[in-house]
Amino acid sequence: MKTLWLTAFLFPLFFSAQTEEDLYTELKLNLPKTKNTAKEVRVEPDEIYLDKKMCFILNLNDADNEGEKKQTEYGLVPYSYEIKSLKGELLFFGVAKKDEAGNWKGIVDFNIIGKKAYRNPKVTGATRLMENLVANNVFNKDCSVNLDNLKQFYEKSNTIEKCRGDN
């Protein structure tokens, strides 16, 4: 009887184990939306698509594969990325590394608006950044950036109290 009770209790736990993907939820900031707002994003190894249109170049620097770390202004990191316009303009630069507990932490510079040191636990890398920006109506279908929404996104969701570059 104890075995049956234990099996009934553990069965749902075993088969409902959540992955990191299951635990992910987007930031919901209720930023204004227009008829031109992009609705979906797809991040590939070298490019980023909005509503199935290639809009951005993604440069990943994954030094961790070779056991190395890259020196950045945020210290030695195993992972950094750049998101650029198709014309090569740097829009975002981000780094990610694991903390002492093994959780990924990220910092992003919003170069397009001259802001540095953005951090939010829901933004740990390029994919999560883009998913959250699209979910908060920052990009338009024509690959342009809604700068007002981007500034609001930065101000409302940045968890770093005093951001460098903000005077």
Regions flagged by a language model, labelled:
Residues 1-23:
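Bacterial Sec-dependent N-terminal signal peptides
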